[in-house]
């Protein structure tokens, strides 16, 4: 973001379209769900009508109906808020998608549904996905490469490359 100057080395960024999905949905309470989903597109300079149409389409893909798209964030269940947050990230068709425990608080059915959508969307757009999870099964389901980290000081203690594509795993 350019907020800090590197003390050594240099920072290179090869991706121009990036999106982030946090562990908490982080929806703006003063924006309806549809406008929360369209937020990144609007920030990127898309016309309001175009951004809202793309947001509505992605909202429907993640399972949000018209009532949910017109609702305020506090009117949505936790699962619906997570759907909106995922839609907000995916609508950007990111080259790089950063996710921090995106499915941690979801029930198993919704988690599986959103994971399948995530795999389909990242494959469709050729997105790189970097995800933090404490769920080894989730990592094995979604990743082609898993890094296990240990803390203090943070370091990689194990790396596993998976030979079967995520979409082919059950």
Residues covered by each model-derived region:
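Short helical segment in ABC ATPase nucleotide-binding domains corresponding to the A-loop/adjacent helical element
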Residues: 34-42, 52, 56, 161
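Conserved ABC ATPase "signature" region
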Residues: 49-67, 120
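Conserved ABC ATPase signature
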Residues: 72-76, 80
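Hydrophobic anchor residue at the start of the ABC signature
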Residues: 86
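Conserved signature/switch motifs of ABC ATPase nucleotide-binding domains
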Residues: 92
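Catalytic Walker B motif of ABC-type/P-loop ATPase nucleotide-binding domains
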Residues: 97-101
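Helical segment within the ABC ATPase nucleotide-binding domain
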Residues: 111-125
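Conserved H-loop
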Residues: 126-132
């Amino acid at each position: 973001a350019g907020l800090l100057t590197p003390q050594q080395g240099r920072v290179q960024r090869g991706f121009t379209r990036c999106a982030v999905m946090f562990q908490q949905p982080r929806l703006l309470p003063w924006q309806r769900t549809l406008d929360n989903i369209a937020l990144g597109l609007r920030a990127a300079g898309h016309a309001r009508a175009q951004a809202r149409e793309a947001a509505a389409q992605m909202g429907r893909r993640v399972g949000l109906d018209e009532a949910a798209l017109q609702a305020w964030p506090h009117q949505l269940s936790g699962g619906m808020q997570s759907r909106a947050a995922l839609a907000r990230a995916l609508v950007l068709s990111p080259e790089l998608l950063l996710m921090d425990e995106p499915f941690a608080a979801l029930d198993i059915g919704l988690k599986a549904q959103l994971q399948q959508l995530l795999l389909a969307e990242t494959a469709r757009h050729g997105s790189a996905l970097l995800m933090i999870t404490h769920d080894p099964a989730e990592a094995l389901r979604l990743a082609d490469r898993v890094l296990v980290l240990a803390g203090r000081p943070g370091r990689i203690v194990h790396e596993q490359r998976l030979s079967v594509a995520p979409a082919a795993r059950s």
